[in-house]
Amino acid sequence: MLALAAGAAWGQSPPASDQAEQVKALLERVEQLEKRVAELEARPAAASITTASVTAPSAAPKPEVQEEAAKPEPTHQMEGHMDQAAVRQMEPHYPNLQIRGFADADFSATDQKGTNSGFNLGQLTLHMASALSPKISYFAEMTFNAHPTNYTVEVERSIIRYDYNDYFKISFGRYHTPIGYWNTAFHHGAWLQTSIDRPEMVKFGGTFTPIHFVGFLAEGNIPSGGLGLAYSVGVGNGRGDIISRPGDAGDNNNNRAWVANLYARPQRLYGLQFGGSAYRDKISLGGGNDYREWISSAHLIWTRGAPEFLSEYEHVNHESILTGKVSNSDSYYVQLGYRMPWVERTLKPYYRFEYMHTPRSEVVFTNLDLVESIFGLRYDISSYAAFKAEYRHTSRQVLATPTFEGIVNGLFVQTSFTF
């Protein structure tokens, strides 16, 4: 631009003074044009800087966030987080209710006159356990029972227990009376036991043994080295107005029953248990018919499964407070079982012999005389279900004669399971 302006000026050939003024004016004009060009060139850069400065606050964090998200934690930090999560998971939470169920379905057919063969629904049992603190726990057992016209719900056990240590545990509630072995080893839930039913002397709803007990119980181990001694001692309500039931709502007299059980589990002979029990109560049948009751029992058990050996003996003494008349009843059973080594050890044949005698002088019980042989087979369908089949040969004494008559043969089948 400067060269063009100068060429134009020199082509006009004005006077010298005028030429100097024109050159000065042209130079000033060129200087103004250069400033203008510089300003115009500076505007896009300023606009881009302004735009970048406006958008930078919102856009800048994105790469940082992405970088932080993609950046892995150090190994020791990850291990620390995992350890903390594991500790939180392992920490106990109270209360922590757990529920387990048992059920069974049965079939029976006998040659006893006046009875019908067919299926029946066994007990539906729920076990509920909850820790309330590191040393306090609660346990409940409820059953749903089928009857000809309806169902009944029974609270079989309801126990709150405080564990001071292994040598002393105290509890209150409704128990299975710790007499002998079977009554506290196998509770409601037929899957728990080898056979279909309990022995007659400890059957649910029976009268020979007080199955349930309402009151207080202390139990624990006894320091005895390898002998493995343990005890349980309880005080509570005895038999109720219906002697097959305890005094759930209160005792029917002012005399408390007590029970004591002592047994050993030698460490060197795992599966072996032997011991004895004693029970004392006052039975009130109404009308001034009160009786002192003494029960003593002993048991010898081997539970390794190959073989299984269960045996119990129980003696019941009743003395009339009014007349002093005494009656003595006896009962025992022996059960043998062997888990076969074939078919993944799922087959277990067993045999049980039962004997029960009540004298004619016995007025607390009805006639309970019994001699029974049971041949059975248990097949464990899975770890939580079993199929059982039994043949029973039963003889009961007829009241009019001193000999055992009333022989009954029967086939019994059951499928039982836990869930």
Regions found by a protein language model. Name each.
Residues 1-7:
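Bacterial N-terminal signal peptides
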Residues 10-104, 419:
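N-terminal periplasmic/intermembrane-space "pro-region" immediately following the signal or transit peptide
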Residues 20, 30-45, 127, 137-141, ...:
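A general secondary-structure boundary signal
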Residues 85-241, 254-259, 263-270, 333-339, ...:
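Outer membrane beta-barrel
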Residues 93, 118, 152, 208, ...:
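A generic structural micro-feature
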Residues 113, 158-163, 171-174, 190-191, ...:
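Outer-membrane beta-barrel pore domains
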Residues 203-206, 220, 246-250, 264, ...:
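Short helix-to-loop capping/linker segments positioned immediately adjacent to catalytic or ligand/cofactor-binding
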Residues 234-249, 281-283:
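Active-site-proximal beta-alpha loop/turn segments in soluble metabolic enzymes
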